[in-house]
């Protein structure tokens, strides 16, 4: 069951046998039976991020750009974009040095 604060209309959460508004601090008593109706359980999933690194096969089809490799100093690398975070965040730009093959990423 969900209960909203009568003062500010925000969600009230159970705390120490009472319902409490986290925004304005309004508290409301609950009965012993009622407290079971308002149990709060948080479920978080551990999502592991998989990142695909492009191997040397097929690199020649990727676009290139002039950027300095942090490992060898060469000034040309392949690049590609990949969504590695939430959809509402920008893509991650990956680079792979044409000379030494070092791969690094850049965030916007």
Swiss-Prot record:
Keywords: DNA-binding, DNA-directed RNA polymerase, Metal-binding, Transcription, Transcription regulation, Zinc, Zinc-finger. Gene3D superfamilies: 2.20.25.10. It comes from Methanocaldococcus jannaschii (strain ATCC 43067 / DSM 2661 / JAL-1 / JCM 10045 / NBRC 100440) (Methanococcus jannaschii). The lineage of its organism: Archaea, Methanobacteriati, Methanobacteriota, Methanomada group, Methanococci. This is Transcription factor S. Zn(2+) 2 binds at residues 69, 72, 97, 100. Induces RNA cleavage activity in the RNA polymerase. In its presence, the cleavage activity of the RNA polymerase truncates the RNA back to position +15 in a stepwise manner by releasing mainly dinucleotides from the 3'-end of the nascent RNA. The truncated RNAs are able to continue elongation. Involved in transcriptional proofreading and fidelity. Misincorporation of nucleotides during elongation of transcription leads to arrested elongation complexes which are rescued by TFS-promoted removal of a dinucleotide from the 3'-end. Pfam families: Zn_ribbon_RPB9, Zn_ribbon_TFIIS. A zinc finger (C4-type) spans 5-24.
